[in-house]
C-alpha cells in the first residue's frame, strides 16, 4: 500500500522567520504519517531553520534542488551530501522551472538522482509537457522519454523508493488544472513506463504525485484516482491553513 505524499514547493518564497512561523502553525495539526506524508520543500537559505522547527513533528523536509557533485568549485550549488548531513529527507529535481530557466537536461537530472541516492536523500523527480506538446497529442511520448532518461541506471530498489511528480507545464501557476481524468491518465502512463523498465512490484511501489495548481478545492478529486499518490503543491502550500487543508484531505 502506497502512503500518500503531499509536498509543498515554496519556490523562491519565505524567509527564515516566516518559515518558523509556518512550521509552528502546522506542526501539531498534521495527519498521521502512516496515512499521509506531509512535506515542505523550501529554499536552501531556509532549510536549517525548517529542519530545526520541524524536529519532533510529523513534517518531513525537502530541498528544491541539488547538484550532482558533493563538493568542489561549483559556486552557488547545493551539495546532496550536506543535505543528508542536515537531515533533509527529500529533494525536488527536474522541475520545469529548473529545466526552462536554468537549462537543465535529462542527463543532469539523472546524475542528480544518482547523487541524491548515493547520499541518502530521496529524489522527487519532476516531469511534464508543454501546452504545445499536449495540443500536438504527444504528451505521453514526451513524458515517457523524460522518465526513461531520469531513471537510467537506477536500480529497481531505488526506483521503488523515489517519488515522481507529473507537472504539466501549462498548469503550473496558471490557475489551469489538468482535469482529474487527464492527471490520472498521465500518472497511469508513468506507472506503466516504470513497469516496462523494471517490473510490476516496482511500479506498484513508486509514488506518483500530480502537480499544477493543486489546491484544497480539487485535492480530494485528484487523490481519489488510483494512480495519483499525492500532490506537489506550489502557491497553496505557502499558507498554513491551506497546507493543512491539503494534507488533511482524508478528513
Curated annotation (Swiss-Prot):
It is an enzyme of class 5 (isomerase). PROSITE patterns: TIM_1, TIM_2. Disulfide bonds: none annotated. It is found in: Cytoplasm. Gene3D superfamilies: Aldolase class I. Substrate binds at residues 9-11, 173, 213, 234-235. Its EC number is 5.3.1.1. Keywords: Cytoplasm, Gluconeogenesis, Glycolysis, Isomerase. Pfam families: TIM (PF00121). Pathway: Carbohydrate biosynthesis; gluconeogenesis; Carbohydrate degradation; glycolysis; D-glyceraldehyde 3-phosphate from glycerone phosphate: step 1/1. Its main location: cytoplasm. The active site is at residues 95, 167. GO terms for molecular function: triose-phosphate isomerase activity. One of its GO terms (biological process) is glycerol catabolic process. Homodimer. Belongs to the triosephosphate isomerase family. Involved in the gluconeogenesis. Catalyzes stereospecifically the conversion of dihydroxyacetone phosphate (DHAP) to D-glyceraldehyde-3-phosphate (G3P). This is Triosephosphate isomerase. It comes from Lactobacillus gasseri (strain ATCC 33323 / DSM 20243 / BCRC 14619 / CIP 102991 / JCM 1131 / KCTC 3163 / NCIMB 11718 / NCTC 13722 / AM63). The gene is tpiA.
Amino acid at each position: 500500500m502506497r502512503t500518500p505524499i503531499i509536498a509543498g514547493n515554496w519556490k523562491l518564497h519565505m524567509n527564515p522567520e516566516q518559515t518558523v512561523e509556518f512550521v509552528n502553525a502546522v506542526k501539531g495539526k498534521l495527519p498521521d504519517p502512516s496515512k499521509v506524508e506531509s512535506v515542505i520543500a523550501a529554499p536552501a537559505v531556509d532549510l536549517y531553520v525548517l529542519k530545526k522547527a520541524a524536529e519532533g513533528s510529523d513534517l518531513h523536509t525537502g530541498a528544491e534542488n541539488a547538484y550532482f557533485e558533493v563538493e568542489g568549485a561549483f559556486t552557488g550549488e547545493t551539495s546532496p551530501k550536506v543535505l543528508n548531513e542536515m537531515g533533509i529527507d527529500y529533494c525536488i529535481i527536474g522541475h520545469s522551472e529548473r529545466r526552462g530557466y536554468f537549462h537543465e537536461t535529462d542527463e543532469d537530472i539523472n546524475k542528480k538522482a544518482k547523487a541524491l541516492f548515493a547520499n541518502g536523500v530521496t529524489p522527487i523527480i519532476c516531469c511534464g509537457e508543454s501546452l504545445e506538446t499536449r495540443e500536438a497529442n504527444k504528451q505521453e511520448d514526451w513524458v515517457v522519454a523524460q522518465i526513461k532518461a531520469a531513471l537510467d541506471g537506477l536500480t529497481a530498489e531505488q526506483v521503488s523508493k523515489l517519488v515522481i511528480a507529473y507537472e504539466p507545464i501549462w498548469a503550473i501557476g496558471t490557475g489551469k488544472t489538468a482535469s482529474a481524468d487527464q492527471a490520472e491518465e498521465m500518472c497511469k502512463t508513468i506507472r506503466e513506463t516504470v513497469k516496462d523498465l523494471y517490473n510490476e512490484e516496482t511500479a506498484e511501489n513508486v509514488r506518483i504525485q500530480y502537480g499544477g495548481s493543486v489546491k484544497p478545492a480539487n485535492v480530494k478529486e485528484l487523490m481519489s484516482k488510483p494512480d495519483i499518490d499525492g500532490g506537489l503543491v506550489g502557491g497553496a502550500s505557502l499558507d498554513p491553513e491551506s497546507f493543512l487543508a491539503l494534507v488533511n484531505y482524508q478528513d
